[in-house]
């Protein structure tokens, strides 16, 4: 990181289930390593949740927040029938914003969350 100019780093930690202690420890180690190389890093820690997950998403988000200190949520798969209602509880209980929504499979389908547009789409 120090030898090149980097503005963003995205880490895909697929399979890091909140119930797998060893995998959660690995992701915490990644975070500690980043902080050693760049003071203050990571600057954002987003949890990407599948809108179809349901009530399990709340316990999942709590565990990731306890481990990493979440700064926001990205909610995907809103192009289907899922409404993602659990995200309201998650954002409220963890005091983190919903920052992005996924409404398809393309890059352009990851959008900055717009609360008014989100509510309008519910009806």
Residue ranges and their predicted role:
Residues 1-123:
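P-loop/Walker A NTP-binding module and the surrounding RecA-like catalytic core of P-loop NTPases
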């Amino acid at each position: 990181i120090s030898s090149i100019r980097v503005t963003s780093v995205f880490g895909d930690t697929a399979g890091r289930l909140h119930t797998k202690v060893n995998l959660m420890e690995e992701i915490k180690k990644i975070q500690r390593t980043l902080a050693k190389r760049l003071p203050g890093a990571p600057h954002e820690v987003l949890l990407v949740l599948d809108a179809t997950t349901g009530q399990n998403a709340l316990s999942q988000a709590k565990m990731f927040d306890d481990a990493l200190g979440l700064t926001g949520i990205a909610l995907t798969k809103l192009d289907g029938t899922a409404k993602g209602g659990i995200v309201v509880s998650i954002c409220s209980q963890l005091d983190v914003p919903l920052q992005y929504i996924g409404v398809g499979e393309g890059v352009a389908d990851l959008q900055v969350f717009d609360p008014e547009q989100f509510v309008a789409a519910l009806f």
